[in-house]
């Protein structure tokens, strides 16, 4: 299968992937639109859209409660909720449609099917976790943890790097593989007309499975974020 081309624009030394930029904006707008719509006209007895929103908030809060001290959980609940929604929506964007120009440029994909994006997202989480650890504990006390006991310092530093790398690669591998298989199913439908009914049924089953996997990956990413954050800010970890 040929590698899809994407439109690029260069601003000085930086090259921007316009498709990736566009789908990231779409992801943000979808999340903002859903939360804005679901939070309008809220009542004491939730129903419909309000129930869905409150369930998502409660679900993500449960992740935070497992890994963060009780007095810290509220401080990071919005962060974890935003990360979960963003990753869940971004994972699923590329499953439902495929947009390509006649010249072969891909105009639609899941942001998380791009390794550079996943590395950037993982770097954001990693930096945020360390910044919060320093803010809560103080710079000296925070650095001391990496040298306690001092023979383990190289292993402690290596662990931080592998956490960053695995967070990105795990997400990329699952979402990219899902889009590749979806593309192969579409090619099967285009190969012969009589393959179309089979490809259609297979695509429905695969899309449903991919949605499930995408949501699981959003859960895993959020849970690992909460785990790494808890190790850095919890008083019980001192």
Swiss-Prot record:
What is the official name of this protein in its record? ATP synthase subunit a
This protein's assembly is summarised as: F-type ATPases have 2 components, CF(1) - the catalytic core - and CF(0) - the membrane proton channel. CF(1) has five subunits: alpha(3), beta(3), gamma(1), delta(1), epsilon(1). CF(0) has three main subunits: a(1), b(2) and c(9-12). The alpha and beta chains form an alternating ring which encloses part of the gamma chain. CF(1) is attached to CF(0) by a central stalk formed by the gamma and epsilon chains, while a peripheral stalk is formed by the delta and b chains.
Which ranges does the record mark as transmembrane?
18-38, 76-96, 114-134, 166-186, 193-213
Membrane-related topology note: Multi-pass membrane protein
The protein's matches in InterPro entries, at most eight in alphabetical order, are given as: ATP_syn_F0_a_bact/chloroplast, ATP_synth_F0_asu, ATP_synth_F0_asu_AS, F0_ATP_A_sf
An annotated GO cellular component of this protein is:
plasma membrane
**Which keywords does this Swiss-Prot/TrEMBL entry list?**
ATP synthesis, Cell membrane, CF(0), Hydrogen ion transport, Ion transport, Membrane, Transmembrane, Transmembrane helix, Transport
Q: Give the matching Gene3D superfamilies.
A: ATP synthase, F0 complex, subunit A
Q: Name one GO molecular function term.
A: proton-transporting ATP synthase activity, rotational mechanism
**Subcellular locations according to the entry:** Cell membrane
Q: Which family, according to UniProt?
A: Belongs to the ATPase A chain family.
Q: What is its main location?
A: membrane
What's a BP term from Gene Ontology annotated to this protein? proton motive force-driven plasma membrane ATP synthesis
Keyword tRNA processing attributed: no
Functionally, this protein is described as follows:
Key component of the proton channel; it plays a direct role in the translocation of protons across the membrane.
Which stretches are annotated as coiled coil? Answer: none
């Amino acid at each position: 299968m040929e590698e899809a081309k994407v439109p690029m624009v260069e601003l000085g030394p930086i090259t921007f992937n316009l498709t990736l930029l566009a789908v990231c904006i779409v992801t943000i707008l979808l999340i903002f639109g859903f939360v804005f719509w679901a939070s309008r006209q809220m009542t004491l007895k939730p129903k419909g859209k309000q129930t869905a929103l409150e369930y998502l908030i409660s679900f993500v809060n449960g992740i935070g409660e497992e890994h963060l001290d009780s007095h810290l959980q509220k401080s990071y609940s919005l962060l974890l909720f935003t990360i979960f929604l963003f990753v869940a929506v971004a994972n699923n964007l590329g499953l439902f449609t495929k947009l390509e120009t006649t010249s072969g440029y891909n105009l639609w994909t899941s942001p998380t099917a791009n390794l550079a994006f996943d590395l950037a997202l993982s770097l954001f989480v990693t930096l945020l976790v360390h910044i919060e650890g320093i803010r809560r504990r103080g710079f000296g006390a925070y650095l001391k943890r990496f040298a306690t006991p001092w023979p383990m310092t190289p292993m402690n530093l290596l662990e931080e790097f592998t956490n960053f790398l695995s967070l990105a690669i795990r997400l990329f591998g699952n979402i990219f593989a899902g889009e590749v298989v979806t593309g192969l199913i579409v090619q099967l439908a285009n190969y012969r007309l009589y393959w179309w009914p089979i490809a259609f049924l297979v695509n429905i089953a695969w899309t449903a499975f991919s949605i499930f996997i995408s949501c699981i990956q959003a859960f895993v990413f959020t849970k690992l974020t909460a785990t790494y954050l808890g190790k850095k800010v919890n008083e019980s970890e001192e």
